[in-house]
Regions:
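Conserved PLP-anchoring active-site segment centered on the Schiff-base-forming lysine
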Residues: 70-124
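PLP-dependent aminotransferase class I/II
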Residues: 2-3, 41-48, 56-59, 119, ...
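Helix C-cap/helix->beta junction micro-motif
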Residues: 101, 159-160, 318
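Active-site phosphate-binding strand-loop segment of PLP-dependent enzymes
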Residues: 113-200, 205-207, 212, 307
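Hydrophobic/aromatic ligand-binding patch that stacks against planar heteroaromatic rings
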Residues: 96-98, 156, 197, 245
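Conserved PLP-binding active-site segment in aminotransferase class I/II-type PLP enzymes
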Residues: 1-75, 79, 140, 158, ...
C-alpha cells in the first residue's frame, strides 16, 4: 500500500446520508410494500415535498437532471433546427439535450458573476434578430450554487418573448433575492446526482408553475403511453421516470437539506477566513442579491506564483480531491463549430475563469481537521 493510499481520502463532494436514517426508513418501507419498480408512493411524495420546498405548483421526478433539461426544451417547443441560447460556462449536461432535440446551441459568455452575462445575451439577440432569427429558448445556469443575474436576464427574455429555462442542478437551496433559484423561469431543473447537495443516487426534478407543461413532461417521461387499457403511443416517449427506491432516498435527503446547506456555507467561510490573505487568491464571487448554497467552494488565482494545477497536484499528493472549473462549451471539441457570443475582443470571461479557477473539496462530512489540512497544503505553496 502506498503512502497516499494510507491517508484518509477527503472528497470533493460525496453522498452524505442522514444520521437519523431517514433514507433507509423510506427504502425499507418500499421493500416491505413491494414498491420496487419506477413510480410509487415515494415518487409522488418526493414530487410534492420538493415542490412545496421550492415554492412551485408542480414537479416531476426524473432519472437525471439531464433528462429534466431535455423535457424542458421539448415542453417549450424546441425542435429540429431551432436555436437555443445556452450559458457557455457549465457542464456538458446543460448543452447536450439541445442536440437531443436536433436544435443548435449558441453559447453565451459569462460576466463577473461567473454566470450568463445579460449584456452578452442582449448582443446575441440583436445579432440573430439582424439575421431574421430568434432563439426558441434560453438556458441559464446557477453555477456552483451562485445565482445568475436573473432580473436582467428575465427582462431580456420577456422583451423578445422567449422562454427561460433555469439549470439549477447545482443550486438547490440557493436564493435569488430571497426566492429559490429554479423557480423564476418557465421551467426549472434540479439534479440529485451523487455529488449534489442532496442525492437520490441518480435523479433529477423538473419544476414549474405551469402545471400543463409538467403534465406533458410526465407523459413523455413514461414512454408517452396513452391512458388506455392496451399499449398505445401517439408520441415519441422516453424512459425517464425516477424509481420509487431512489425517490425514497430523496425524501430522506430533503429532510436534512438545511443541515447540508449550513455545512456547505461553513466550509466556504472557513476557506475564506484561512485563505483570503494569500496574494492573488480570491474566493468565488457572491453578489448582493445572492444567498448561495455554496455547493462547491471555488477560488480563482491572479498570480504567476501558483497555478490551479499546482494546487490540484499538491492536494492529490495528500489524498485530497479537487478539480478544475468546468471547461467552457465553446472549447469542447464536440461544440467547436457552434457560435459563441462574447463582449471580449480577445479570449472570453468563461475561458479566463476556467484557466484560473479551481474547485476545493466541499464535502459535508469534512471535519475542522480536514479543512485545516486542506488549507495547510494550499498555504504551503505560497511558502
Amino acid at each position: 500500500m502506498t503512502t497516499n493510499e494510507q491517508k484518509k481520502r477527503i472528497y470533493l463532494s460525496s453522498p452524505h446520508m442522514s444520521a437519523e436514517g431517514y433514507e433507509k426508513a423510506f427504502i425499507e418501507e418500499a421493500f416491505a410494500t413491494n414498491w420496487i419498480a419506477p413510480l410509487g408512493p415515494n415518487v409522488d411524495s418526493f414530487e410534492r415535498e420538493l415542490a412545496e420546498r421550492v415554492g412551485v405548483k408542480a414537479a416531476v421526478a426524473l432519472s437525471s437532471g439531464t433528462a429534466a433539461i431535455h423535457l424542458a426544451l421539448k415542453a417549450v417547443g424546441v425542435g429540429q433546427g431551432d436555436i437555443v441560447f445556452c450559458q457557455d460556462l457549465t457542464f456538458s449536461a446543460t448543452a447536450n439535450p439541445i442536440r437531443y432535440q436536433g436544435a443548435i446551441p449558441v453559447f453565451i459568455d459569462s460576466d463577473h458573476t461567473w454566470n450568463m452575462c445579460p449584456k452578452t445575451l442582449k448582443k446575441a439577440f440583436e445579432k440573430y434578430e439582424a439575421m431574421g432569427q430568434k432563439p426558441k429558448a434560453v438556458i441559464v445556469v446557477h453555477l456552483y450554487g451562485l445565482s445568475a443575474d436573473l432580473d436582467a436576464i428575465m427582462e431580456i427574455c420577456r422583451e423578445y418573448d422567449v422562454p427561460l429555462i433555469e439549470d439549477a442542478a447545482e443550486s438547490l437551496g440557493s436564493l435569488y433575492k430571497g426566492k429559490q433559484t429554479g423557480t423564476f423561469g418557465d421551467l426549472g431543473v434540479f439534479s440529485f446526482n451523487g455529488n449534489k447537495i442532496i442525492t437520490t443516487s441518480g435523479g433529477g426534478m423538473l419544476v414549474s408553475n405551469d402545471e400543463e407543461k409538467i403534465k406533458k413532461a410526465r407523459y413523455w417521461a413514461t414512454q408517452a403511453r396513452e391512458p388506455v387499457r392496451y399499449y398505445e403511443h401517439k408520441d415519441l416517449g422516453f424512459n425517464y421516470r425516477m424509481s420509487n427506491i431512489c425517490a425514497g432516498i430523496g425524501r430522506g435527503q430533503l429532510r436534512v437539506l438545511d443541515e447540508r446547506i449550513a455545512k456547505k456555507k461553513y466550509i466556504f467561510d472557513y476557506y475564506k477566513e484561512h485563505l483570503s490573505d494569500l496574494e492573488g487568491l480570491e474566493m468565488m464571487p457572491i453578489q448582493d442579491y445572492d444567498d448561495p448554497n455554496c455547493w462547491l467552494s471555488c477560488i480563482i488565482l491572479s498570480t504567476d506564483r501558483v497555478k490551479p494545477t499546482d494546487i490540484i497536484e499538491a492536494l492529490e499528493a495528500e489524498n485530497i480531491e479537487s478539480r478544475p472549473i468546468w471547461k467552457p462549451m465553446h472549447l469542447q471539441p464536440y461544440y467547436q463549430n457552434c457560435d459563441f457570443i462574447t463582449l471580449q475582443e480577445q479570449g472570453s470571461v468563461s475561458e479566463d475563469i476556467f484557466n484560473r479557477g479551481l474547485c476545493l473539496p466541499s464535502d459535508t462530512k469534512m471535519t475542522d481537521e480536514d479543512l485545516a489540512k486542506v488549507t495547510m497544503v494550499i498555504r504551503g505553496l505560497w511558502g
